[in-house]
Amino acid sequence: MDAKLLEILVCPICKGPLHYKKNEQELICKPCRLAYPIQDGIPVMLEDEARKLPAEEEVE
């Protein structure tokens, strides 16, 4: 994932910062508790495509 792209991407819902999880290939929004997938190196920034993080899953 390109570092410059990570700097400008924000959560489409709350406009908050995203955190890159390399192993899971996801961008995490901590306040919304959503994980946006990265497919073929392209972040899919659609709310309908995001995975809701369960309460028990730790958000780094």
Curated annotation (Swiss-Prot):
GO terms for cellular component: cytosol. SUPFAM superfamilies: Trm112p-like. InterPro entries: Trm112-like (IPR005651). HAMAP family: UPF0434 (MF_01187). Belongs to the UPF0434 family. This is UPF0434 protein Mfla_2088. It comes from Methylobacillus flagellatus (strain ATCC 51484 / DSM 6875 / VKM B-1610 / KT).
